[in-house]
């Protein structure tokens, strides 16, 4: 099998590339990047089956030619609100299986609409297979499966728990930060009271996590909020939220976003400020955040044995102690998607979010533990056991 890694030498993509480089099933890996020199230089750190090329994903002809020459594409080219939909369309049209780390809700809506097109041509596409979305979706799915019926799904993550990626081929404004500005300004889409609606980003939401108590978090514009009701239309509420280790985290964010919304500073400038702040921040240890919400989690509320119940799913305490970069947290789940595909464990045609029934959660988290050198098993908090 031949795999094309779009953005494969970038801050997220290089971690996925490193993780798949030793997959014996792969005949060839092509690292494609707008920065040709960076792609070629990064490819030199692997064996001969890995090559680097320059590729502008907005050049539709060259993109199509590259896709035709490969069996599957791993897309880490952001921001996805610009590049997600056209690249997925191109992959389907050129008979190339597809996986990405799309973390914007707007293109997620449009990409899910391509499901029938992908089914017609026998293409498997998984969108949002990173940390959040990605790991959070699968944790949320584990939580849902513990209940007899589900009315609310919440996926969440700690703004301060992941270290910024230290390496990247990217120059100029950081794409991840542009994404963050996009999803923290204005309104974002959520699913509430059985329908999709727009709410102000960073709106405060109280989270009741079994065994931990009630904490405040803030609504974030990630795809989980809309992908869960897409795949599970009987649920009533779906939110993605973020929290900080300190109140000052959200306060600083809101000040910078206010400056951007009032056009006092540009979105690029705001993104650069956030990127600088990330590099200056001391990340909290696990012991400093274990009393609050987990660093990453899925939470479901519903009914169990006729009574109201809730289930929270996160990594075990020992596993949460390991510090990871944003690149690792995002790129490694994508690599595992490819691994499961190569093993024949992802074999459905269509366009899916991670929770859409195409990934077995037990298979995924077992592979994740092996890749990261972690203890197997998740920490599952059940309200009826507390």
Task: Describe these PLM feature segments.
Residues 35-37:
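Helix N-cap at the beta1-alpha1 junction of Rossmann-like dinucleotide-binding domains, i.e.
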Residues 79, 90-108:
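ADP-ribose/adenylate-binding Rossmann-like module
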Residues 56-69, 79:
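Conserved Rossmann-fold cofactor-binding substructure of NAD(P)-dependent oxidoreductases
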Residues 5-19:
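N-terminal Rossmann NAD(P)H-binding glycine-rich loop of SDR-like oxidoreductase domains
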Residues 102-123:
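Rossmann-fold NAD(P)-binding glycine/threonine-rich loop
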């Amino acid at each position: 099998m031949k795999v094309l890694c779009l953005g494969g030498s970038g801050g997220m993509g290089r971690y996925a590339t490193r993780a798949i480089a030793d997959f014996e099933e792969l005949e060839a890996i092509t690292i494609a990047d707008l920065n040709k020199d960076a792609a070629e230089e990064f490819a030199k750190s692997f064996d001969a089956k890995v090559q680097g090329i320059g590729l502008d994903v907005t050049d539709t002809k060259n993109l199509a030619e590259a896709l035709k020459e490969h069996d599957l594409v791993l897309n880490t080219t952001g921001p996805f609100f610009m590049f997600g939909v056209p690249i997925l369309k191109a992959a389907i049209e050129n008979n190339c299986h597809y996986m990405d780390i799309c973390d914007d809700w707007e293109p997620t809506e449009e990409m899910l609409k391509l499901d029938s097109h992908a089914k017609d041509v026998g293409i498997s596409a998984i969108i949002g297979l990173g940390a959040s979305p990605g790991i959070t979706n699968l944790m949320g799915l584990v939580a849902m499966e513990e209940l007899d019926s589900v009315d609310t799904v919440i996926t969440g993550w700690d703004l301060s728990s992941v270290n910024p990626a230290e390496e990247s081929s990217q120059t100029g404004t950081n794409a991840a930060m542009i994404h963050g500005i996009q999803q923290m300004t204005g309104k974002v889409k959520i699913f509430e009271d059985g329908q999709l609606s727009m709410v102000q980003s960073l709106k405060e939401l109280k989270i009741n996590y079994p065994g931990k108590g009630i904490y405040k978090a803030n609504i974030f514009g990630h795809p989980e909020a809309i992908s869960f009701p897409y795949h599970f239309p009987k649920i009533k509420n779906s939110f993605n939220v973020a929290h900080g280790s300190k109140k000052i985290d959200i306060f600083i964010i809101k000040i910078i976003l206010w400056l951007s919304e009032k056009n006092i500073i540009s979105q690029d400038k705001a993104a650069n400020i956030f990127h600088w702040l990330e590099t200056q921040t001391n990340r909290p240890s696990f012991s400093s955040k274990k009393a609050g919400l987990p660093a990453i989690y899925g939470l479901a509320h519903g009914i169990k044995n006729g009574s109201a119940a809730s289930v929270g799913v996160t990594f075990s305490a020992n596993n949460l102690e390991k510090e990871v970069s944003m690149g690792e947290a995002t790129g490694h789940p994508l690599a595992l998607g490819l691994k499961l595909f190569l093993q024949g464990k992802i074999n459905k045609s269509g366009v899916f979010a991670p929770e859409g029934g195409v990934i077995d959660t037990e298979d995924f988290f077992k592979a994740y533990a092996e890749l990261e050198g972690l203890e197997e098993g998740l920490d599952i908090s059940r309200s009826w056991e507390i």
